[in-house]
Amino acid sequence: MSHNTFGHLFRVTTWGESHGPAIGCVVDGCPPGIHFTQAEIQADLDRRRPGQSRFVTQRREPDEVKILSGVMQDGETLVTTGTPISMLIENVDQRSKDYGEIAERYRPGHADYTYDAKYGVRDYRGGGRSSARETATRVAAGALARKIVPGMVVRGALISMGEKEIDRANWDWDFLHDPENPFFTPDPKSVSEFADYLDGVRKAGSSVGAVIEIVAEGVPAGLGAPLYGKLDQDICANLMSINAVKGVEIGIGFQAARIHGEENADEMRSGNDGYPRFLSNNAGGILGGISTGQPIIARFAVKPTSSILTPRRSIDRKGAEVEVVTKGRHDPCVGIRAVPIGEAMVACAIADHYLRHRGQTGKG
């Protein structure tokens, strides 16, 4: 097992390294007859693309996707054929020379030591396979996953950065698409505060973490299976696989441990449409590992990147004690570009469970 594949029926295999000639993915299990355009895939990639503001890495990658297999032209759109869909993204702005000094040194907080401990060799150029560069391929796969579940909408937002938090009373999904919003924040009033805060962090050569919230609406009840195929289990696994993610919660998550049962349990009434009407959504749209039909809500915490200009104590491959300064082009807050990545990983998990549910029950 190489552990480069996730999903059961909607299976995604990614390949490539940060400073290799290209990265890509193969999506296997996508049903035939799904219509989409290459522009739709590209639009999601453009949201994750580096170099779009002073608040993210200045590496200039166009991230232009090439779809190599698994589709046919059908008028103005492409249609899936049911065979593996292969997508490729070329790397065009690598600067491997920036990493020469850390070829033999372990960067604190990075996967340098653990990759060496496991494989006995590591690609020091931009982190190789452990780089978030790989996540562009997940976003491409996620754009396809959005097409699998009819009526599903998956959106994400950055809700805190370091010690700064949004005001949820100002939440506006439409503001995410505003050209004056480089942070994927749903709170228009938070932009200037985030900008001033991150400018200070960036100029100090440091970094900061963030919390991202993902909301999936239009997900039917019944997806997921006990006990070892829970929907929230796979959502958490997908989100935890993203670089720098150190925690995931569903619904109110850890807050549930601080309240009483009568506060936590989502009460129900009969709805006018014949379906239950929940009076709250503390469970985040999942009970017993199975979707309730309410919006699925997940949050994940992203640590500050360890690629900073502050000298840090470490060792080299021979065990000698050294100081490490990480040069190159890095995000002062990797949480910003993690928003579309989180959306993609949640979309992939739900699409996979939708196909599994349809196969098991005949419902879809």
From Swiss-Prot:
Its EC number is 4.2.3.5. GO terms for cellular component: cytosol. The keyword Cell inner membrane does not apply. Reduced FMN (FMNH(2)). GO terms for molecular function: chorismate synthase activity; FMN binding. InterPro entries: Chorismate_synth, Chorismate_synth_AroC_sf, Chorismate_synthase_CS. Pfam families: Chorismate_synt. Pathway: Metabolic intermediate biosynthesis; chorismate biosynthesis; chorismate from D-erythrose 4-phosphate and phosphoenolpyruvate: step 7/7. The keyword Lyase applies. It catalyses: 5-O-(1-carboxyvinyl)-3-phosphoshikimate = chorismate + phosphate. One of its GO terms (biological process) is amino acid biosynthetic process. Its cofactor is FMNH2. FMN binds at residues 129-131, 243-244, 288, 303-307, 329. Gene3D superfamilies: Chorismate synthase AroC. This reaction introduces a second double bond into the aromatic ring system. This is Chorismate synthase. It comes from Chelativorans sp. (strain BNC1). The gene is aroC.
